[in-house]
Structure formats: C-alpha cells, structure tokens
C-alpha cells in the first residue's frame, strides 16, 4: 500500500484548514510573515532545548546555528519595527521532546 495514498486525505484536510485560517486573517487585515527558522542563539528559555546545526562555509570552521523553538522572538521584532497585525504558519523545533504527546518538529 502506498503510504502517500493513505495520508492524502489528511494533507488535503490540512490544506483546507490552513486556507480557511489564512483567509480569516487576511480578511481581518493581518499580514502573513515567514520568520527565519535558523537563529544565532538557542534562546533563553531554560526548559526549551534548541536543535543545533553546523553551516559549512568558506571560513576555517563551520558556523553553529539553532532551529527556533518558537517564532515568537522574530515576530516580536517585526512588531517592534512597526508591523501591527501579523501571523505565521511555521514549524517549530524542540530537542528532547519526543513521545506520544510531543514531537521534535511541530
């Protein structure tokens, strides 16, 4: 059995739900933003653990970056810069969270 065929109804339902939510936000005057997933710092939340990655470059050593645990900080910077009504559909990543109630990416 094709795994994609089994999941297709969920993909289509998710797409319809996101489209309806997006349409509501746009009708209310919100702007959709795409905050960067990679950041310089893992964050200050002691109970959240960011996933680290190494970015290879022309320099002698790779650069360490972290996948965000939440888009909140990036979105707050946009609000501080003058944006008033924003929303985002973006994945979040948390290390050490995996089980029946938690996923590393959500």
Where on the chain are the PLM-derived regions?
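Class II aminoacyl-tRNA synthetase-like tRNA-binding/catalytic domains
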Residues: 1-106
């Amino acid at each position: 059995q094709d795994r994609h065929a089994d999941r297709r109804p969920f993909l289509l339902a998710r797409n319809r739900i996101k489209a309806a939510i997006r349409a509501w936000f746009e009708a209310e005057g919100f702007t959709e933003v795409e905050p960067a997933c990679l950041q310089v710092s893992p964050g200050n939340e002691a109970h959240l653990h960011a996933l680290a990655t190494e970015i290879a470059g022309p320099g002698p050593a790779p650069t360490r970056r972290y996948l965000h645990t939440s888009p909140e900080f990036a979105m707050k910077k946009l609000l501080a810069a003058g944006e008033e009504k924003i929303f985002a559909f973006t994945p979040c990543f948390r290390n050490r969270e995996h089980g029946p109630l938690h996923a590393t990416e959500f």
